Amino acid sequence: MPSPDSMTFEDIIVDFTQEEWALLDTSQRKLFQDVMLENISHLVSIGKQLCKSVVLSQLEQVEKLSTQRISLLQGREVGIKHQEIPFIQHIYQKGTSTISTMRSHTQEDPFLCNDLGEDFTQHIALTQNVITYMRTKHFVSKKFGKIFSDWLSFNQHKEIHTKCKSYGSHLFDYAFIQNSALRPHSVTHTREITLECRVCGKTFSKNSNLRRHEMIHTGEKPHGCHLCGKAFTHCSDLRKHERTHTGEKPYGCHLCGKAFSKSSNLRRHEMIHTREKAQICHLCGKAFTHCSDLRKHERTHLGDKPYGCLLCGKAFSKCSYLRQHERTHNGEKPYECHLCGKAFSHCSHLRQHERSHNGEKPHGCHLCGKAFTESSVLKRHERIHTGEKPYECHVCGKAFTESSDLRRHERTHTGEKPYECHLCGKAFNHSSVLRRHERTHTGEKPYECNICGKAFNRSYNFRLHRRVHTGEKPYVCPLCGKAFSKFFNLRQHERTHTKKAMNM
């Protein structure tokens, strides 16, 4: 290996064939360019005399091999001209002499790089200044507001747009900028591409973001579900919706394996494992993992119902409740069972129905082991063990385990019966009672036993019937331990103990 004193530029240069160059990725080509410039800079700094033709050939190699074949150093007009780049023009107008001719110049007649405004007495210094200039300049496409740190990246950007025939060379009105001027100049470009909404004045940096925002004003929903026809503003919302049809749950908990259709639901679920329940209700002390859940819960205490129906005026504490209610007006049932074709107005009702086909009961009580098809039913059941009744009537003080029971009870005070049968006009205080009544007109019996085929118009009667097959007797007498399949039968039995006690 040559010593540093005897080392020449020819000793350290690397030549690539076109085939070898094609095997390099963008980062490797950039690394080669940087190392090559470092080598030139180092040899110049230790006073080495460099041959102009070798240095310029090496500087040109990256461009030759990049398929654009733009020679900035020999003056060929392939894609771009020297006069378009002022500092290159000045350097090569002044630097065409041979090295021997350069040495014949006196101190009073140096080479002058007009663009840089500095005098050089040696071609080596001029070459070093070219390298420094290339390093401290940025290449800018004024049309697109893009800034590039090297000439190769700028040319790659230019090539992308020149492939499109609708763009002319006027798009590449570029300039060189000093590092010190980069920040204010880039701000100028940012201002040029600021996009403003004509309706509300909100500004955006990308045209795609502006178009998406404008759909809020226009109500445009270009992304439609091919299964139920429901439309959405954003394609991401459509993808989430499609999972309600397919049942896809791509977000799985790495601790328990439970899967979710939304990443936000997974994050909320993960808090159950970490027991992060920092959101505490100051009225009842109940804790929540998410502040939005706390706000929803607080509305049960305050009676706050900010979401009102435009058709009937009925108000709800949650936006999802309002959307579900609106379907009672328009009859929309977007969620269809792929096994029997039955349609539902809410996805939770569909999931609950599907479990009637497969018998799945994923939600188990940790106290008694009883399992349920819905988590809400499990929570309702757990209150039997705890005795919790969080929903209290502000008129009479009676408390209930469920908010729906409280609402139904409040109608006994107000006399409100908002659910009316469109066939006979009879009104009811609860939607479930209306649905049960409508079956007397239609003869519908949606609850069918999968063992004997008997059908029922009420879920309660269906549950009682199943106990005939299963032998289940959930109602146990605390005095003698005798069990019954119906609560009514337990009450009758308990009276026998009362009579015995009275006769003694």
From Swiss-Prot:
KRAB domain mapped to chain residues: 7-78
UniProt cross-references to Pfam families, sorted A to Z: KRAB, zf-C2H2, zf-H2C2_2
A GO MF label: zinc ion binding
Entries under Gene3D superfamilies matching the protein: 6.10.140.140, Classic Zinc Finger (3.30.160.60)
GO process annotations (BP): regulation of transcription by RNA polymerase II
CDD domains according to UniProt: KRAB_A-box (cd07765)
Zinc finger (C2H2-type): 195-217, 223-245, 251-273, 279-301, 307-329, 335-357, 363-385, 391-413, 419-441, 447-469, 475-497
GO CC term, one of those recorded: nucleus
Keyword set, alphabetical order: DNA-binding, Metal-binding, Nucleus, Repeat, Transcription, Transcription regulation, Zinc, Zinc-finger
InterPro entries named in the record: KRAB (IPR001909), KRAB_dom_sf (IPR036051), Zinc_finger (IPR050331), Znf_C2H2_sf (IPR036236), Znf_C2H2_type (IPR013087)
Family the entry assigns: Belongs to the krueppel C2H2-type zinc-finger protein family.
Alphabetized PANTHER family for the sequence: PR DOMAIN ZINC FINGER PROTEIN, ZINC FINGER PROTEIN 936
Function (record text): May be involved in transcriptional regulation.
Protein name per its UniProtKB record: Zinc finger protein 596
Provenance organism: Homo sapiens (Human)
